[in-house]
Amino acid sequence: MQTKSLKLSSILFLLLFIPINYLFGQSELPKSKHYNLEKLADGVYAAIHNDDGGFAICNGGIVNLGDRTVIIDPFISPTAARDLKKHAEILTGRPVSLVINTHCHDDHTRGNQVFDPDANIIGTPDARRSIERDFYKAVESEKESSPKELLNFQKWMEQATDEEEKKELKMWCGYHQAKIESFPELKMTPPNITITDTMTIWGTKREIVLIPTGIGHTTEDLIAYLPADSIIFMGDLLFVERHPFMGGGDPASWKKTLQKIALLKPKIAVPGHGPVGDTNSIHVLIKYIDTLTEMVNEEIKKGTNKDKISELPVPEEYKNWWFSGFYKWNTLNFLYNIATAKANKD
């Protein structure tokens, strides 16, 4: 009996030092109510936002370089980021030492604070400047607006009759709930390392290539490329089955950036929002930018006024995409304004 007890104790002791994915197989990944982990390659995981009320909002990533652990875009909520940190440590067997911000937007960066000061945070100079300039101002504004917005979305969700619409509205409820829940603990945590040129971080298992892409979705974006795995984490340069948010970048430059990234022919392209995509997903977004740009320009040539352009129906191929509220913003407040400003300049 004593021998059996010693054997059992030895087994339990050894299990403490084996990462959970080796115990249960790669299909048994850690769970979070805020996101769903998807294994993309050995040691590479996408953390895809859970639309059913999760607090992640954007998609993130975990990359095991072999001798260090990297997190990409640690969400809008410190609560969701804590799950990501815990799961990264479980899956790789070590603490997180690097965090990558693909751009400045709060849904990709407010989780930074969970990893500070133990991990270095890498982003572009503009990401750092934007966070330093806007963080506290945005938080103070949202303390007033988010509770009202949450009530509005809850009301619209109750009134909705279409199931897909209800699902999307529930996602937006989660967005505002995540903000409200995080207000008491938020602290500004911008990147402490900024890069303006390609940076390769070499690990014992794989390298990760960080590529600043200039103006696109924002005034400075970057992608995280794993050449050995043919995987790219694209941040909000890529939306899949979602209307992209256009509001701080430039559609022509965005399109050129996507065309360059498509030349890499990634087998897997992780978007900032939506399900995991591939090279074809990049081409779909290029076509979206072209379609909306041409549509708005054609209406301007006809003399259609701004209000009428904002009422243009969503093209058939994009009718089932989520983030439908961005469509009106994209056509009216972004593409229209850019086109008319260019015409006036010419």
Positions of predicted regions on the chain:
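Accessory terminal helices/loops
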Residues: 26-27, 140, 157-161, 166-180, ...
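Conserved beta-strand hairpin/beta-sheet module of binuclear metal-dependent hydrolase folds
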Residues: 38-87, 222-234
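Bacterial N-terminal signal peptides that target proteins for export
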Residues: 1-12
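Metallo-beta-lactamase
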Residues: 32-34, 39, 68-70, 76-78, 137-287
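Divalent metal-coordination and catalytic microenvironments
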Residues: 43, 63, 73, 88, ...
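Bacterial N-terminal signal peptides
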Residues: 10-22
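Active-site metal-binding motif and surrounding structural segment of the metallo-beta-lactamase
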Residues: 67-68, 79-123, 262-265
